[in-house]
Structures are given as C-alpha cells and as structure tokens.
A protein has these predicted regions:
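Short, hydrophobic beta-strand segments
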Residues: 106-112, 301-304, 351-357
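Acidic, metal-coordinating catalytic segment for phosphate/diphosphate chemistry
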Residues: 308-395
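A glycine-rich phosphate-binding loop feature that marks nucleotide/adenosyl-phosphate handling sites
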Residues: 145-148, 229, 284-294, 336-345, ...
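Short, charged/polar surface micro-motifs in flexible loops or helix N-caps
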Residues: 13, 36-39, 295-298, 344-347
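Active-site-proximal helix-loop elements at catalytic-domain edges
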Residues: 1-8, 100, 245, 340-350
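DNA-contacting surface of Y-family translesion DNA polymerases
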Residues: 7, 181, 191-333
Length: 395
C-alpha cells in the first residue's frame, strides 16, 4: 500500500516563539541565541532577518554587520521545549506515528488516518490551522510517499507552506533540482558528481548505478536510489523508541566543529562508555546507532544491525564509524554526537575488561587495533586514554 508521510517544519521556530511572547518583536528582524553565552552564533533568526542574508550558525558579529538594527534575543530553551511538546501533542491527534527529529521538526505517518479528513492535503491543512490557532505559530508541511520526498517537499516551500511531492510530480518538481539539494550530498560528493557530468537529480537518476557504485561504493547505490525519489525508512514513533531497550552516551560540544579527528576520537570515548555499561549490565547488543546534531539543531540518527550480538568495543566503534555522514559533517558543523546500542540481550558470560587501559590494549590485540588505526591515520596525539579526553578537548 502507498504510504503517506508528512514532514512538519516549524518556521524560524525560536524567533517565532519570541515574537508570539513579545508582540513588539513581530515583523522585525530577530536573532535568537546570538549575543547570549560564549558561543556567539545565530541559533535561528526570523524571516525578516533572513532577508539580510542572515542564517543559522552564522557568527553574531557577521549578523550584526549585515543588519545593524537586528534585535538580539537571548532565547529560552526551556520554553522552546515546552512549546515543542505542545506541538507534538497536537500532531498526536492526527496519528500515533510521530517521529520528532529535532525540537521543531517531525515526520508523521498518516497512511491509516488521512481518509478521516478526506485527503492528505486536508489533514495537513487542518494540522497547520490547529497549530496556528492554539499556539499562534506557522509551520511548513511537506507531503509525500516517503520521508526523503516529504522533507524535500517542505524545504521547497517555506515559510507557512503546504507542498506535495507525489511520485507523479517528480518529473516536474524533483528531477530538475540541483544535486546539492539532495540530502547526503555535501560539497565533496557534489564536486565528484559534477566531474562525472552530473548536475541535476535527473542526471544522477539516469547515470548507470553500477558506475556510481564504482565511484562512491555503497554511497553510490544510495545516491541512485534517492535520485529516483525512493526511500523506505519507516517513521519511528517516540513510544517505540522509548520502549526499546537501549544504552547510549551523548556529548554536546563546547564549540561546534567539523574536525573529523576530533569527532572520531569523541566517538571512541562514547563507545567506551557504552561498552562499559553494557558489560556492567551483562548485555550484548545487536544494533549500533549513531546520532549527530548539527549546529542548526537538525538531528540525524542512523543505525545498523549486526550479524551477531556483541559487546566488543572495536566492533561497535567501527560500525558506528561506517554510519558517520562524513560529507555532511564536514559541510555543517556538529554540535552533539551520540553513540548507542539497541536490541539488547542478556549475555551468558561477559568477561570484565577495562577498555583503553594500557594493560588491556597491550594484552588484547583487538582492542588495540582501533587505537592503532587512528594513531596511524591521524598521528599519535589523536588518541589518549579515553577518560582524559574531555578534559583535553574542553579546556
Ligand atoms: Mg524549522
């Protein structure tokens, strides 16, 4: 059966919330986050400010240069989280399958419920009206048969938009798009694709998949599938994620970064912590999950299921590494990294090993591999004992 997925994206969320709270700010260029704290970057800005070329993650100094009369607002994360929860409540009135992907974005699977409203478009309009009526906030909704196209549809039509991207509209709306607009195509991939003469999604779709795979490995296959508008990732409801037995560790960076060495080292530390907990609880994991939050607060979670259950730090780290979207990480700075394991089962027998202690590295060849790999690639100072890393990085 054809699925119907919505992607809801609140328009300039933090700025809108501030404008609702203080009507004197309405219709004015508002910058949230800029002046507050040590970070000195724009968390988000109103559409009035965007007209001056200001965008999320820009330095406040640059934003002030572009629009000297912009109003800087410190922002109140607690309030945003509170309102985000209210939006989720409203979305839950339309379907139980709601997957929030950030504080102001979510996917909804309305396959089973849209007929109650007549059409998917009517359900989406009702949802938009409801959010507007109850919270005075506008959002943009994309409607399609899968998550990839729903997100693309909402990106096309901001703010206060409602846009469909059905399979029969791809010819007109999707295939003419430039390749860099496709999720997962960062500057590196874009350059490489252009070298092959691929400029639009149509070029990418028509390019032989075999040749793409030769150039990009597994990513090539994925790119080809996306260029055809295909994606079968299900919408995971929040409850479903909560119920699942899982263990994870996350770390919010002191400063956003695109430094791969740093991020990989951080992933080791996080894996180390996860594995320590796994072993302590005597569990084995079947699935490895990586979470990345970018400086604009957009968040991705990727996971892969292993062939067999494990509590081996080497296996879990290397698996997490295959999930790292290197292109995106380099082109968008990262704010938070999380490594986790799910699908846990009790282990029959788990030897207690302290990971990354000198003794275990020298005695246990396998644990040492990861360390040596990284040292080979990135130099001997790229990895030190896990427990000392946060100190080294954050001061
Ligand atoms: Mg938004």
């Amino acid at each position: 059966m054809k699925r119907v997925i919505l992607h809801i994206d609140m328009d300039a969320f933090f700025a809108q919330v501030e404008q609702v709270k203080n009507p004197a700010l309405r219709g004015k260029p508002i910058i949230v986050g800029g002046d507050a704290g040590h970070r000195g970057v724009v968390a988000t800005c109103s559409y009035e400010a965007r007209k001056y070329g200001i965008h999320s993650a820009m330095s406040s100094a640059e934003a002030r240069r572009r629009c000297p009369h912009a109003i800087f607002v410190g922002g109140n994360l607690t309030n945003y989280v509170y309102i985000s929860a209210q939006i989720q409540d409203i979305m839950n009135d339309y379907t139980p399958i709601v997957e929030p992907t950030s504080i102001d974005e979510a996917y909804l699977d309305i396959t089973e419920s849209y007929h109650l409203y007549g059409t998917p478009e009517k359900l989406a309009q009702d949802l938009k009206d409801n959010i507007k009526k109850r919270l005075q906030l506008t959002c943009t909704v994309g409607i399609a048969e899968n998550k990839l196209l729903a997100k693309t549809a909402s990106d096309m039509n901001k703010p206060d938009g409602l846009n469909t991207l059905w399979m029969n509209e791809l010819e007109e709306k999707f295939f003419p798009m430039e390749i860099r607009k496709l999720r997962g195509v960062g500057p590196q991939t874009e350059k490489a694709l252009k070298r092959l003469g691929i400029n639009t999604l149509r070029d990418l779709k028509d390019y032989p998949e075999k040749k793409l795979s030769q150039n990009f490995g597994l990513h090539g296959e994925h790119l080809s599938k996306m260029a055809h508008g295909l994606s079968d990732t299900p919408v995971h409801s929040f409850e479903e994620m909560e119920d699942e037995k899982s263990m994870s560790h996350e770390h919010t960076l002191y400063e956003d970064t695109s430094d791969l060495i740093f991020l990989k080292s951080l992933m080791i530390t996080l894996t180390d912590k996860v594995v320590a907990r796994l072993k302590k609880a005597q569990f084995l994991a079947k699935t490895v999950r990586l979470k990345i939050r970018y400086s604009d607060f957009s968040t991705i979670t990727r996971e892969v299921t292993l062939n067999s259950m494990t509590d081996d730090v080497n296996t879990i780290y290397k698996t997490a590494l295959t999930l790292l979207p290197v292109d995106d990480v380099v082109s968008n700075k990262v704010r938070l990294v999380g490594v986790g394991v799910t699908k846990l089962h009790e282990a029959v027998e788990t030897p207690q090993i302290e990971l990354f202690e000198e003794s275990s590295i020298s005695k246990k060849g396998k644990s040492g591999d990861v360390v040596e790999d990284i040292r080979d690639k990135f130099g001997k100072f790229s990895i030190v004992r896990a427990s000392s890393l946060p100190y080294r990085w954050e001061h």
